Amino acid sequence: LDPVLALAPVLLVLGLAPQVSPGPGTARVLVQTTRGDMVLEVDTARAPVTAKNFLRYVDARLYDGARFHRTVRLANQPGQAVRIQVIQAGPSPARARRGFPPIPLERTSVTGLRHLDGVLSMARDGPDTATADFFICVGDQPSLDYGGQRNPDGQGFAAFGRVVKGLPVVRRIHGAPADGQNLTPPIVIRSMRRLP
């Protein structure tokens, strides 16, 4: 049995079946977590490098068992002049090592994507260092775009998609118990699969 077809009854029961097929240049991904499910739309047309990287982690099932481990709220960023609100997820360090090399930074000045509410973006240190960790914006976060002040290098982060179903799940994870920015306990990603 095709694993994607096996998910169809679950999607219908949860009300998560996409009402519209993904448009050209996009792919949809079902994320099942211990706090609820969401559907992501990955923009393969405008952010091809970042989207391809994310989807290869999905297809290799390296996000299965990964965790939303970080919640950044206005109140838990002491000493930070530019504050943001996001949740961040990624595989364990051991699983991440089985992943793929870092990718070039696709700047929002090139892709035209912006860090709006529900947008997906890659976590990074310096430019061209993103691998598996990603985050979801809670509210609009323009300081994460190219030229924004959150990262001192001003290069911004690579937005590559958005949550199209399940924003209440994002907000539940954002408000979950945390010690500083570390979710306690982390929210487990049971599985991530492409949708037809």
List where the protein language model places each region.
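Cyclophilin-like peptidyl-prolyl cis-trans isomerases
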Residues: V13-P196
